Amino acid sequence: MSVWGRRELVLAGLALAAVPAGARGQAPATGPVAVPGDAVQGALVVGEVGPGAEVWVDGKPVRVQNGRFCFGFGRDAEKQAEVRVRFDGGREVTRLVAPQKRNFVIQRIDGLPEQYVSPPPEVLERIKRDAYAVGEARARDTDEMWFADKFIWPTDGPISSIYGSQRILNGQPREPHYGVDIAAPEGAPIIAPVGGIVRLAEDLYLSGNTMVIDHGHGVSTSYLHMSRIDVKVGDRLNQGQQIGLVGKTGRVTGPHLCWRLNWFQTRLDVALLSPPRKGDRA
């Protein structure tokens, strides 16, 4: 199945109790556990439980709000996730969810300025500070529920790179690509795909003008290489609100938006949450 058509599997695949039709946003009644056997690598999995239930994923407690919780599988996840639910009254159930393996392409990019492929020693400390700031922005665990809404695309343009591709930059192997690149022209508007709170908005060495938006429960999206940032840290955003413009700042060969998704520090595939677009490829 194409990655562009897996939203329903990702968002609705983990149902820990039956949800009546038309009851979105209402916690289901306590009932038998029904969990699919798998979710693809890179998926954000959203589950629902009954009132008062507590949830642990791989032994760690996760936030439950209005019956909803989530967790994610990274690009290279192989181990099954153990989901343990304790219902109000003490009854517990446990289910295993296995990450389904995906095949990722190799992508070669040449013509990058050498200082961005092999940064000089004098900028390595800045790169470390940048990474720390991004990590702090992605570490928020708020009780907002925007992550469970339907995402829209933040800008228009062809997809030039997909999640998970193994990158070779100027002939040198580097870590995989963890975003979706949208080849929009410089100055094209970027909008919020769902509601959220701005947690980071600054110029970083490798990713240029960069923004991180918190969507609740540890789910965040990031926007890289922007030419302009139109909002500030702490702003609450509505879906469709303009947040900046497409650019070519940082380590790039041309204008585009690199759009990313995280569950805390786990890097996920934002395309799995986005509606399919005509002409997109798997």
Where are these regions (language model features)?
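Non-catalytic surface loops within mature trypsin-like serine protease
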Residues: P51, R75, P99-N103, S165, ...
